[in-house]
C-alpha cells in the first residue's frame, strides 16, 4: 500500500521554502517546531515516517546538522464510522505555459471532501507574477467546473492582487515566496465534497482577456507552481505523482 500523505516536510506546514520563523494557521503552525492538528483517523493501524534523502550519511554529523525528534498524540476507540474518511495530502510542482494548458493540483478518485491547500506561484528569474488564473473544481467527472474561483488571490481571501504586506489568518493567508507568492486556505466549515472523483486545476477562465492566454503561451513565459492539497477520502486512493528526489 502507498501512503495517504506524501509531502515535503516544509510544504506540509505551509512553509514551502522552509525559511519562515513563524507560521500561524488553524491546522498547522511553526515556531521552533512543526505542529499539525488535522484529525487523522485510522481503523487498524497508523504509521508516520519522516524520510531524509539528502547527501549526508546517517550518524553524528547528520544529527548535528539536523537534530530531529517527534511526538504523536492519539487515542483508541472501539469502532469507527463506516463512512469515515482518511486524511490525505499530496504535493505537486510544475513549470508550464498556463496560456496553453492548466496546472493540475489534484486528481482524486473515491468519495471524500477537499479541506484545504497551499499554492506557490512565480515566474522564475523575474519579479512579479500574474494573478488572473482561476481555481477550478471538477466534481464527479464534470466537464465544466461547478466550483470556480476567479483570480488566484481571491480564493485565498484577497482581491485585486495580493496585499503589499504579508498576512496570516487562521484559515487564509499570503506571504512572499522567492519573487512570487504563496497562499493558503483551509475549508473547515465549507469543505468541497465529492462522491466519485475530484479534479482541481489552476488556469485562465473562459472569460479571461485573450491577451493573457497569448502572453503566457509564449516561450520564456513559463510559470512555476507548486501545491500541497489536503483532503479526506475513503480508500483506496488514486496513485500520487512521483516525488522529486533531493
Language-model segments: residues:
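Beta-strand-centric surfaces of beta-sandwich/beta-rich domains
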Residues: 1-246
Amino acid at each position: 500500500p502507498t501512503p495517504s500523505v506524501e509531502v515535503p516536510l516544509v510544504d506540509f506546514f505551509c512553509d514551502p521554502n522552509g525559511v519562515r520563523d513563524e507560521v500561524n494557521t488553524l491546522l498547522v503552525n511553526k515556531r521552533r517546531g512543526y505542529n499539525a492538528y488535522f484529525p487523522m483517523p485510522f481503523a487498524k493501524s497508523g504509521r508516520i515516517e519522516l524520510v531524509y534523502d539528502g547527501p549526508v550519511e546517517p550518524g553524528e554529523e547528520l544529527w548535528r546538522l539536523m537534530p530531529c525528534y517527534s511526538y504523536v498524540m492519539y487515542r483508541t476507540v472501539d469502532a469507527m464510522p463506516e463512512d469515515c474518511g482518511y486524511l490525505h495530502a499530496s504535493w505537486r510542482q510544475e513549470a508550464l505555459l498556463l496560456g496553453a494548458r492548466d496546472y493540475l493540483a489534484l486528481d482524486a478518485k473515491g468519495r471524500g471532501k477537499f479541506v484545504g491547500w497551499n499554492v506557490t506561484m512565480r515566474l522564475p528569474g523575474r519579479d512579479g507574477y500574474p494573478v488572473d488564473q482561476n481555481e477550478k473544481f471538477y466534481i464527479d467527472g464534470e466537464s465544466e467546473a461547478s466550483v470556480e474561483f476567479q483570480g488566484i488571490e481571491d480564493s485565498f481571501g484577497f482581491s485585486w492582487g495580493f496585499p503589499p504586506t504579508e498576512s496570516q489568518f487562521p484559515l487564509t493567508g499570503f506571504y512572499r515566496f522567492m519573487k512570487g507568492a504563496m497562499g493558503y486556505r483551509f475549508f473547515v466549515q465549507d469543505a468541497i465534497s465529492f462522491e466519485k472523483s475530484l479534479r482541481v486545476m489552476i488556469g485562465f477562465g473562459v472569460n479571461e482577456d485573450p491577451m493573457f492566454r497569448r502572453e503566457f503561451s509564449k516561450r520564456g513565459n513559463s510559470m512555476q507552481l507548486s501545491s500541497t492539497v489536503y483532503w479526506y477520502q475513503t480508500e483506496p486512493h488514486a496513485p500520487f505523482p512521483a516525488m522529486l528526489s533531493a
